[in-house]
Amino acid sequence: NCHKAVYHSIYLRRLTPVYLYPDIVPGTSLAGTLTKEQIEAALIQNPDASAVLLTSPTYDGITADIASIAETVHRFGKTLIVDAAHGAHFGFHPGFPKSPVALGADLTIVSLHKTMPCLTQTALLLQKGSRVSTERLRLFEGIYQTSSPSYLMMAAMDSCMDMVKKHGAGLWDSFFTERERFLERCSSLKRLQVLTDGTKWSRKMTSETGFLMDSGKILSETSKTCLTGKRFYDILLKQYHLQI
């Protein structure tokens, strides 16, 4: 579930990674995310580890129990870094999971362009607390970041945040109204399954794994239909102009 930027960092800094593998969500082919038990066991076996990095939410919207993981990581005196690229909208509406920042993560990366109205490449690195040195963070930011930042992108991020501040509540309320309408219409489907937060599937997943589901993600399961995933993708794109 890691972004290739993580592997680039490992290569450039000559780090020694320890890999933890998430379980598959029961009844699906979806990779879950990590649990506090997995992380605690890994920290016991690797006491010289500097930090824990995990992806939450995943590309499919599956979210880890960041609060309990943060407590575990900090108990061992380590830093928690969360790649929340697909969770830039977290914390802006009670219908979404809380932001990792609010749950104890020391560093959180969010990609505005993935789930918010912003230009491609726009992202934020969020810091909480003093476990990570701000001076050191700024030092390496200056090393790896361009010395000629795009004012177009910075203006886009400002505009995005301004819109969320002024109109976000109403826009998210409208989103959830339309979402409920969509799910109600999908409830009559006999073969095509819709997997998202609030459905029987997500409640079962949470009870079995402890993972949460991002309400902003809507997954479709085609295994009980005559369609392949690729064919379903093509139909949505060509006939309905929806790209997934």
Spell out what each predicted region is.
Residues 1-196, 226-227:
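Conserved PLP-enzyme active-site core in the AAT-like
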Residues 177-244:
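Conserved C-terminal alpha-helix-loop-beta "cap" of PLP-dependent enzymes
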